[in-house]
Curated annotation (Swiss-Prot):
Signal peptide: none annotated. This is Histidine decarboxylase. Keywords: Decarboxylase, Lyase, Pyridoxal phosphate. It catalyses: L-histidine + H(+) = histamine + CO2. PROSITE patterns: DDC_GAD_HDC_YDC. The modification N6-(pyridoxal phosphate)lysine is found at K233. One of its GO terms (biological process) is carboxylic acid metabolic process. Homotetramer. NCBIfam families: PRK02769.1.
């Protein structure tokens, strides 16, 4: 590959930008703490996982063996036997959500999909693309679905086969819809378990709840029919990706035999990235369950540290149990822009993913939020200046490298 000097300079400039901002992210669920150096050599190959990783295909350069290991890992993590499940490495959380909703629609073609107003924006696209009837359900103040409103809407619709989109960690507030409560309420109104579908969007929390002592219900043992998790959020990846797992009996309904690839196609996309399954495989193989627990505990401790600091300054900050999403009142647009914070209405959040291995970035943000909240007292007490500077840059510790 030959580039002009101007094009090369443009790449070099972007390289410096990436180096400077590698660990900037505190407002979005993305973990920059990874090192896939041992996989760099495979970038010279066009690796394509078209089709089903469980069957031999006609395209030789695939990473099916690695993808199978990844799916075996997540089947166990989400409490379903591998032989009773099927899933794949997706392009991200939206594809995983679409896959789950697609299975639900094929199982209940006339069913209505119910989702809370705190649900990820991808659901609005999905229901349009799949042409599923849908109903938005009110949210409780803490971000969970309003269970009374859910049941009222199901009753008003006289829906016999509801499709419930369950949030296992909402985007803005990290709320987890109570799967046990939903099932209990449906049972109370006489809807049998086999007559409805539960899809769980666990984009961030899917790699948190399996590694805490007292997780909220979220997996197949707790009653879900499908679940998806992102690969670039808690695990970390240079390429956005995700994992979706579903019950095999439901997946078989959408399987199509494609003669020219000599494989059954069960996925949303045709050609699929063959590099991301290898990255997920490397990340999972290089961290023991104890190491994942330590990573999760570190992130949870950092989140609680942020809550404590903000509350000590009189700022109404909070988080859910087992959540690394810290919710607080929306600061000025200057602070939100500087720290790339996600805001919605009068609410903002910070997210303590594993690349925050010390508290420098968290402290820098909180210092400014406190200064804005109580400027005179805070500045007098700490004598701070230069708050308009760039947040401190950091280097990730090597003991968290994936490879």
């Amino acid at each position: 590959m030959t580039l002009s000097s101007a094009d090369q300079a443009r790449l070099d400039q972007f390289w410096e930008h990436c180096l400077k901002n590698q660990y900037f992210n505190i407002g979005y669920p993305e973990n920059a703490d990874f090192n896939y150096a041992q996989l760099h050599r495979f970038l010279r190959f066009s690796i394509n996982n078209c089709g089903d990783w469980a069957e031999p295909g006609n395209y030789l350069l695939n990473s099916f063996d690695f993808e199978k290991d990844v799916m075996a890992y997540f089947a166990e993590l989400f409490s379903i036997p591998l032989e009773e499940s099927w899933g794949y490495v997706t392009n991200g959380g939206t594809e995983g959500n679409m896959f789950g909703c697609y299975l639900a629609r094929e199982l209940f073609p006339t069913g209505t999909l119910y989702y809370s107003k705190d649900t990820h924006y991808s659901v609005a696209k999905i229901v349009k693309l799949l042409r599923i009837d849908c109903r938005a359900v009110e949210s409780l103040p803490n971000g969970e679905i309003d269970y009374d409103d859910l049941m009222a809407k199901i009753a008003a619709d006289q829906e016999q086969h509801p499709i419930i989109f369950v949030n296992v960690g909402t985007t803005m507030r990290g709320a987890i819809d109570n799967i046990a409560t939903i099932q209990q309420r449906l049972e109370e109104v006489g809807i049998p378990r086999e007559d409805y579908y539960l899809h769980a969007d666990a984009a961030l929390s899917g790699m948190i709840l399996p590694f805490v002592d007292n997780p909220q219900p979220f997996n197949f043992a707790d009653g879900v029919d499908s679940i998806c998790v992102s690969g670039h959020k808690m695990i970390g990846s240079p390429i956005p990706c995700g994992i979706v797992v579903a019950k095999r009996e439901n997946v078989e309904r959408i399987s199509v035999d494609v003669d020219y690839i000599r494989a059954n196609d069960k996925t949303i996309s045709g050609s699929r990235n063959g590099h991301t399954p290898m990255m997920m495989w490397a990340a999972l193989r290089s961290h023991s369950p104890a190491q994942w627990r330590r990573r999760v505990r570190h992130s949870l401790n950092s989140a609680q540290y942020a809550v404590d600091r903000l509350q000590a300054a009189g700022i109404d900050a909070w988080r859910h149990d087992n959540s690394i999403t810290v919710v607080f009142p929306c600061p000025s647009s200057r602070i939100a822009r500087k720290y790339c914070l996600a805001t919605s209405g009068d609410t903002a959040h910070l997210i303590t993913t594993p690349h925050h291995q010390d508290k420098s970035m968290i402290d820098a943000l909180i210092d400014e939020v406190i200064a804005e909240h109580q400027p005179n007292e805070w500045r007098a007490g700490l004598g701070l200046a230069g708050l308009d500077g760039v947040p401190p840059e950091r280097v990730a510790a090597s003991h968290f490298d994936v490879i």
